[in-house]
């Protein structure tokens, strides 16, 4: 990886991390669903006039938008609003990888291999450690935690829709997909 690529990768990590801080601050002034809706409106509304609708079946676009754009962020914003620490939410949200593997096995008949099963076991152990107050010393409201897991599951469902979308097109316009799916909420 070149130095430029490394700096760009670091920038992505910083922006991603700041996203959770901005959510936390924004929730002090606005209800969670309104903040989430505003977030997507600010992305989608001006961009749809410049970016063509992706050439994918409407049902897949709607499914992707409902899971990635609406449900994931509705659950996440509500979780943080109900007391889930933003930093912890960013970690728990990564359970989407576990959910994606499991959904991929059920949806596409993908086979799970030893390394994947070991990763799943490690992920479940990590989630259990995060839940256990005596192990991490941080009180987490169970409702916030469960809403964050629901957000992770929604993200995983979106990943499944994304895989289906990719199979319908030889070269889908990813930016177009993201922008137009943001209209769904």
Predicted regions and their residues:
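Glycine-/small-residue-enriched transmembrane alpha-helix faces in small-molecule transporters
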Residues: 1-34, 139-164, 185
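Specific transmembrane alpha-helical segments of multi-pass solute transporters/efflux pumps
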Residues: 14-15, 19-20, 48-93, 101, ...
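Small-residue-rich packing faces within the transmembrane alpha-helices of Major Facilitator Superfamily
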Residues: 17, 37, 41-45, 124, ...
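Hydrophobic/aromatic residues within transmembrane alpha-helices
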Residues: 26, 35, 79, 106-108, ...
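A helix-boundary/kink motif common to multi-pass secondary transporters
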Residues: 31-32, 84-85, 108-113, 170-173
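Hydrophobic transmembrane alpha-helices of multi-pass small-molecule transport proteins
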Residues: 41, 47, 64, 102-103, ...
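Transmembrane alpha-helical segments that form core, pore/gating elements
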Residues: 44-47, 100-101, 106, 137-185
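Loop-to-transmembrane alpha-helix entry segments
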Residues: 56-62, 90-93, 109-129, 138-145
């Amino acid at each position: 990886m070149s130095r430029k690529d490394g700096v760009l990768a670091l920038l992505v990590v910083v922006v991603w991390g700041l996203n959770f801080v901005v959510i936390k601050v924004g929730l002090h002034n606005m209800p969670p669903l309104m903040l989430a809706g505003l977030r997507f409106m600010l992305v989608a509304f001006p961009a749809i006039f410049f970016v063509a609708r992706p050439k994918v079946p409407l049902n897949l676009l709607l499914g992707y938008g409902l899971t990635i754009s609406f449900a994931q962020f509705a659950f996440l914003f509500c979780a943080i609003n109900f007391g889930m620490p933003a930093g912890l939410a960013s970690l728990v949200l990564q359970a989407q990888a576990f959910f994606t593997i499991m959904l991929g096995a059920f949806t596409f008949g993908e086979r799970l291999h030893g390394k994947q099963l070991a990763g799943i076991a490690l992920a479940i152990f990590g989630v259990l450690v995060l839940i256990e107050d005596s192990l991490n010393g941080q009180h987490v409201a169970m409702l916030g935690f469960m809403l964050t897991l629901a957000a992770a599951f929604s993200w995983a469902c979106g990943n499944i829709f994304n895989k289906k979308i990719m199979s319908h097109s030889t070269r889908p316009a990813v930016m177009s997909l993201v922008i137009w799916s943001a209209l769904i909420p």
